Amino acid sequence: MGRRFKFLQKLAFLGQNHRYKALERDEVDTLIDEQYELKAIEREKAVAALPPREACKCSKEELARTFHVDLDSGLSEFAVAQRRLVHGWNEFVTDNTEPVWKKYLDQFRNPLILLLLGSSVVSVLTKEYEDAISIALAVLIVVTVGFIQEYRSEKSLEELTKLVPPECNCLRDGKLRHMLARDLVPGDVVSLSMGDRIPADIRLTEVTDLLVDESSFTGEVEPCSKTDSPLAGGGDLSTLSNVVFMGTLVQCGKGQGVVIGTGEQSQFGEVFKMMRAEETPKTPLQKSMDKLGKQLTVFSFGIIGLLMLVGWVQGKPLLSMFTIGVSLAVAAIPEGLPIVVMVTLVLGVLRMAKKRVIVKKLPIVETLGCCNVICSDKTGTLTANEMTATQLVTSDGFHAEVSGIGYSGEGTVCLLPSKEVIKEFSNVSVGKLVEAGCVANNAVVRKNAVMGQPTEGALVVLAMKMNLGSIKDSYIRKKEIPFSSEQKWMAVRCSLKNEDEEDVYFMKGAFEEVIHHCSTYNNGGIPLPLTPQQKSYCQQEEKKMGSLGLRVLALASGPELGRLTFLGLVGIIDPPRAGVKEAVQALSESDVSVKMVTGDALETALAIGRTIGLCDEKLKAMSGEEVEGMEQDALAARVRQVSVFFRTSPKHKVKIIKALQESGAIVAMTGDGVNDSVALKSADIGIAMGQTGTDVSKEAADMILVDDDFSAIMSAVEEGKGIFYNIKNFVRFQLSTSIAALSLITLSTVCNLPNPLNAMQILWVNIIMDGPPAQSLGVEPVDRDALKRPPRSVKDTILNRALILKILMSAAVILGGTLFIFWREIPENRTSTPRTTTMAFTCFVFFDLFNALSCRSQTKLIFEIGFFRNRMFLYSILGSLLGQLAVIYAPPLQKVFQTENLSALDLLLLTGLASSVFILSELLKLCEKFCSRAKADQMLPEAV
């Protein structure tokens, strides 16, 4: 109190012209507190994220000083609030932060949309308000449908995946709190336990038998042992044993550490930067639509120029001819094209969603239709990522096979070749081998999931299949010598419960290390001396199992290290996912090549490749080292012949994809790890796993397989091919109708004849009539034979030569038939009458409906695809027919459309004539089938 009183006195001093009053004690307290708070705020805001390579060198005390944190009590809420102002939330800022209005406006960047808007403006200027309103409405429908679908797709993705783990255990204000991981800031003290997903980059300060699965980050299958000791130098990220990274998983043990990086300041953030640096290529559909838009633009303006020139030569007013030219240009543009394309893509996405596949961008579905190479990661994609014991060899020569995959415990162990099922110790040698694997084990299997190392989980499940799953409880563990990459084995010293026997060691590990500690081998429960011949036999068995791609573990037991009894070998593998083999076969039959790109060894990769039918006797494999050493051009020349790439890194994967793309391939890449994300972004189609996939891989991908089912890709390819054919069907129908209408009006203008169709009739044909039938073609069910067709070339456009010929043929038939009726009905004085236009108008509409019927398939007859298969098409045709009859016979509509009643004979005549376009199209399909069959029969003897 005395010191504070003297301080107050010093504040009362004389200035030159003023006397300052002494402050009260509470005012001084407030002043001091404010100064202290300002300094505290500055100190907290100055705290920065620490790179892992620097953090790994710090001692615990240096780490605490750097982050201004008490390791025993954690940060205060005040410190957290200040640091969050600088570092933000522990999450990634994704592309989905783009404003909604901007996403909506982006839909207008399509060239067809811009052309339609231009036509609408010109229609307003020329007072063609009906056309302007119709076109504007069509544009709004297009952009709204596209916006809603992409918006819903993004929302579905947000629901499926979170960019950071949702919860964690954090020490704050001296209390351990269970909180959202997004709340973490640099300097937070986080507690980790078995099964936790690491919520941020963390420098460990305490560990107890901590093993972390970093396979999603580094590609290494085996969990990494962690320490809390400072390291001498910061090497590769995978060697930083005292740092754990966001998104990796605690397999066993527990630990505590300080957060050194959050959100985009974590190592995930570095991968995100690489991912965003990769430019996403345009899809083939986007390229085709762009080209079609340009072609239609050139065609439309050419017609305008031609008609204005003809009209000027004939002495007609230029403004009148310009109005006609613009109207014809609008008619020539298939205004339903963007709508049907969008609806077709949306329906494809919805069908795929039912098959548990989320598509982030609509055109990606179609891109799969021309995909001819699928590069797939092995672990977790082609395989189940569930290590499973499949073979046993005992030291005395018994062989057994194990059925059942995964961690459910379902399956049996059978002796070979007798197929005798073994339970417990019905075969002593097998029983002792399985017992050792279960006791020298730290994994726990619950509810079909493993807590701990997957390899150890496989041994526990093996014991469960022999009813020995609880045998570990019969022992009291007294000591453990943990596994290390240097010694390549682990051992436990145990004693039987309630029995006064000497302790026994159980050991498992690499064969060459375990056999080194053995002096005897087990022979039906009796230890015999381990002779060189016996060692050689066991070594041969180990090599034989290894050549099959199995991970081989040797097991032994005995009273002390160095005097152990060798028990035998267990072969473990990550088995293929259900349905993968069938999917690979179906894709291969449709000329889609599946390539495995993995970080595993050659033997393991080949074993899985053979199991799923990926490769044949002419298999070619290439290592990541070879990929790195080759020039890009040389790699592009060889990469198509290689089926398996092994020992690859993320950098190698990107190089492989780019080489495939340079060779002309459309590449789909599947993956689930952080190490796959850059490759997913580089590929034409990136496909991530929904369950085992990391958040970064999902963000990088274009599609997500919700159930991690590789066979769903087969359905996606089928959808992609079917969607493109549906779009071609619609384009054929729409353009043949538009060209026929355009030619009809152009010919009548050039020949100085009266117009066969008036303005309202043209509007009916182009906007109303072409809408429902055309859109129903877009929802035609996917052709069942679509998957069998080879992938479409990326150079192919929607309007290829064959389709153009069919369009021109249909347009010529429609034009010829309508002109025949018009010429038949026109009076001698060549003046237009209501009957003349009604007959020509109805004839054109009937042609339109029959043309739609023939356009349901480019190759199959109507009887093959099924008349009633597409109900929406039938409803649209029926609705259009009823609408046309209403226009002809309803008095109010007769006045609007300037029509008159037609007799039944007139309708029969028009129906018979209009059906010619359908009959001719079906005959053409028959001819094509006959020619294709004859060509195939001719090639068969040559092939033989």
Curated annotation (Swiss-Prot):
Catalytic activity annotation: Ca(2+)(in) + ATP + H2O = Ca(2+)(out) + ADP + phosphate + H(+); Mn(2+)(in) + ATP + H2O = Mn(2+)(out) + ADP + phosphate + H(+)
Keywords, alphabetical: ATP-binding, Calcium, Calcium transport, Cell membrane, Golgi apparatus, Ion transport, Magnesium, Membrane, Metal-binding, Nucleotide-binding, Phosphoprotein, Translocase, Transmembrane, Transmembrane helix, Transport
Location(s) in or outside the cell: Golgi apparatus, trans-Golgi network membrane; Cell membrane; Basolateral cell membrane
Entry's Gene Ontology BP terms: calcium ion transmembrane transport; intracellular calcium ion homeostasis; mammary gland epithelium development; manganese ion transport; positive regulation of calcium ion import; protein localization to plasma membrane
Residue ranges, annotated region (Interaction with ORAI1): 69-93
Amino acids binding Ca(2+): V330, A331, I333, E335, N766, D770
Modified residues (Phosphoserine): S266
Predominant location category: Golgi
Residues bound to Mg(2+): D672, D676
Topology, Cytoplasmic side: 1-104, 149-229, 313-329, 770-802, 854-872, 925-944
Its membrane topology: Multi-pass membrane protein
Gene3D superfamilies referenced in this protein's UniProt entry, alphabetically: Calcium-transporting ATPase, cytoplasmic domain N, Calcium-transporting ATPase, cytoplasmic transduction domain A, Calcium-transporting ATPase, transmembrane domain, HAD superfamily/HAD-like
Function of the protein: ATP-driven pump that supplies the Golgi apparatus with Ca(2+) and Mn(2+) ions, both essential cofactors for processing and trafficking of newly synthesized proteins in the secretory pathway. Within a catalytic cycle, acquires Ca(2+) or Mn(2+) ions on the cytoplasmic side of the membrane and delivers them to the lumenal side. The transfer of ions across the membrane is coupled to ATP hydrolysis and is associated with a transient phosphorylation that shifts the pump conformation from inward-facing to outward-facing state. Induces Ca(2+) influx independently of its ATP-driven pump function.
The family this protein is said to belong to: Belongs to the cation transport ATPase (P-type) (TC 3.A.3) family. Type IIA subfamily.
Protein name: Calcium-transporting ATPase type 2C member 2
Natural source organism: Rattus norvegicus
Lineage, top ranks: Eukaryota, Metazoa, Chordata, Craniata, Vertebrata
Gene: Atp2c2
